[in-house]
């Protein structure tokens, strides 16, 4: 999770020179400008390529795996055009962990992980439509990208998070949910959605994978708790799916894992806003646990 202190923008510094040089090696025509984003994991530099606005994303050495997944995703997009608008790729290099792409005109839907400003119905509807289109996309090459849910749940269980009853319920719910089979963005915060030319465009594909159905919906549900009507609208999307194997069961597995990660991250923060948010996350955790039991009871 990023905080404001993690991200710095402005003119490139001397420390950025080596990473910018990698971008220019990969895309010699790229003319770098100001730093758009800087953190311990990556550097994103705005600039131009042949008169077109562009972005160069360069991962720091310890975080190159994330860049590889995003490059692999663009390879999928080239092989099988995605059902949602995405920025064009101009150049990339796996060894250098560099990706140069189109810089979109427009603005992100919300800069904060947990939006505190209203999200319009049109924007939320556009994001949900993109999620729906994406889940029906079936690029064959993504078959090896299935997430190991059993392994993740066992890792959480090893931390002493689940009591015996909760653990048994989750294993049963996972069994009933079937195998991961839905291509998902994987990090669908509203800062990763740009409103550009009347469309909602998804950016930053470093966490894309084959998930259980409803991963992106579960993340939106968790993050948009303060946006009036958002959770109810998302739950309509879940309920409209064909059956429990595509609907509520996998949604709750995804939500449990996301809430665990988010609650753990919030333990590091001591500001009043984060403490208040942690209370809300704890309430969402208990609600989700109750709904897991409820879902299994109705499943028979």
Curated annotation (Swiss-Prot):
TM spans (from-to): none
Pathway entry: Antibiotic biosynthesis; calcium-dependent antibiotic biosynthesis
InterPro entries: AGP_Transferase, Aminoglycoside_PTrfase, Kinase-like_dom_sf
Organism of this sequence: Streptomyces coelicolor (strain ATCC BAA-471 / A3(2) / M145)
EC number: 2.7.1.-
Effect of a null allele: Cells produce only the non-phosphorylated variants CDA3b and CDA4b, while S.coelicolor strain A3(2) / 2377 produces D-3-phosphohydroxyasparagine-containing peptide CDA2b as the major product, along with a minor amount of D-3-hydroxyasparagine variants CDA4b and CDA3b.
Protein name: 3-hydroxyasparagine phosphotransferase
Top enzyme category: transferase
Top-rank taxon: Bacteria
Keywords attached to this entry: Antibiotic biosynthesis, Kinase, Transferase
Job description of the protein: Phosphotransferase that is responsible for the production of the 3-phosphohydroxyasparaginyl residues found at position 9 in the non-ribosomally synthesized calcium-dependent antibiotic (CDA) derivatives CDA1b and CDA2a/b. It is not known whether the phosphorylation reaction takes place before, during or after peptide assembly.
Keyword hit for Transferase: yes
One Pfam family recorded for the sequence: APH
GO MF terms, alphabetically ordered: kinase activity
A Gene Ontology biological process term: antibiotic biosynthetic process
SUPFAM superfamilies assigned to the protein according to its UniProt record, in alphabetical order: Protein kinase-like (PK-like) (SSF56112)
